Amino acid sequence: MLRIAVQSKGRLFEDTMNLLKETGIKIGSSKRTLLVQSSNFPLEVLFLRDDDIPQTVADGVADVGIVGENEFVERNENADIVKRLGFSKCRISLAIPKAVDYPGVEWFNGKKIATSYPHILRRFLADNNVKTDIHVIQGSVEIAPGIGLADGIFDIVSSGSTLVSNNLKEVEVVMQSEALLIGNKNLSDDKKAILDDLLFRVESVLIADDKKYVRMNAPKANLDEIVKVLPGLKSPTIIPLADPEWCSVHAVLDEKHFWEIVGQLKALGAEGILVTPIEKMIL
């Protein structure tokens, strides 16, 4: 049995539970208990505060955990990064009142900064030879300048709407963060085998996230040019049609290049282009 620690609420909780669901792992409700066992996979889920997850994994109370990179770096616990998961992305930034003229990071010299991430902040300030008074608070960091507690803040930024609603502006992006799968350094061989199975499922889901399955009818006269346009995993699938002048072409495309490639396909005479999402992809 492998024990995974995950955040008990919030955006990372939702993203993590969605990932586990997409891997086919069934997890019961967490509303009444902190530890839930899967009904179809050797996994039990331990629900914790996000800032407790790194230590819980490092100490071996949990074997692995899914946690924000910001918390992992801040806690500096002795655990391995098993995989970057690419979701729950945010950044940790310095922000100050909108009305303030900001010349650069030297503005913070002698100022007070409120934050829940003092260790990351101290490293950044030391790298930039800036001396400040760091005021550590947990939660509602964004209100600190408005109530006179600090001159600026160092906090998580996602959309930036919280800063705007508190009359603040982002002036320095210090760190980019995403969800990480972290692991204890001393897993048994049995638990490593379960983790490998879990990783196989997770990677199959993540790889498919930005891919589209595309089918089209293509004129055989332009088939060579169409095949060159399609990146594909290896080469596209070509299927004959009743009309000998045409064939059906199937391929997998990266979503970020999708519209550019579709435009080229249409210019080469492709018709009836059908696009479907991919739930999982096993390479």
Go through each PLM region and give its residues.
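Small-molecule-sensing regulatory modules
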Residues: 1-43, 69-80, 84-91, 99-283
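Active-site-flanking structural segment that lines cofactor/substrate pockets
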Residues: 37-55
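Pocket-flanking alpha-helical
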Residues: 51-56, 61-78
